[in-house]
Amino acid sequence: MGLTVSAIFSRIFGKKQMRILMVGLDAAGKTTILYKLKLGEIVTTIPTIGFNVETVEYKNICFTVWDVGGQDKIRPLWRHYFQNTQGLIFVVDSNDRERVQESAEELQKMLQEDELRDAVLLVFANKQDMPNAMVVSELTDKLGLQALRSRTWYVQATCATQGTGLYDGLDWLSHELSKR
C-alpha cells in the first residue's frame, strides 16, 4: 500500500524525465538552441565536435538534451546516442535551401533505425528571422514528413537567437510525453 501511494504521489507531483536527442546538419543552430533553453541567453558557439548535454527543466519535466555535432564526418556517430531516446529534435536551417535535401536524407536515415522507432519527432525549423527562410509547410514537404505514417511528429518554426518557438516545441514534447 505504501508503495502505491508513493508511486501515485510521485506521478502527480514528481518531475518526469525525458531523454532528448538533438541533431541536424552543422550550423543549423542546435547548440544555440540548447543554451538558449538552458540559460535563457545566447552564447558564443563553435562547431560541436562530439556532444553537449544539459538538463532543461520545463513544466515539471526534466529534459536531458543531448546536442550532437552535425558535421558530415561525425554524423555516423549519431547512432551511439539513439538508445533510450524518447524524443528526437531535428534542427533544420530554414534559410539553407541548398542543403535541405541533405537534411531530408539524414533524417530519413535516422528514422529507419530500430532504436528510434518509439521516439517522437520534433523538427525545429530554425532561423525563421532570415528573409529567405522556408515556411513550415514548405519545409514539411521538402523533408518528406507527410509520408511518416507510424510516427508522431511536429514541425515548429523557431528563431534560436530570439528564442521564438522554442518553448512551443517543448510544450508539444511535454504533451506527447504525458500521453505515454
From Swiss-Prot:
UniProtKB keywords: ER-Golgi transport, Golgi apparatus, GTP-binding, Lipoprotein, Myristate, Nucleotide-binding, Protein transport, Transport
CDD domains in alphabetical order: Arf1_5_like (cd04150)
Gene Ontology CC: cytoplasm; Golgi apparatus; plasma membrane
Residues carrying lipid (N-myristoyl glycine): G2
GO molecular function: GTP binding; GTPase activity
Pfam hit, one: Arf
Location in the cell: Golgi apparatus
Any one GO biological process: vesicle-mediated transport
Location (main, coarse): Golgi
Biological function: GTP-binding protein involved in protein trafficking; may modulate vesicle budding and uncoating within the Golgi apparatus.
Record protein name field: ADP-ribosylation factor 5
Origin species: Gallus gallus (Chicken)
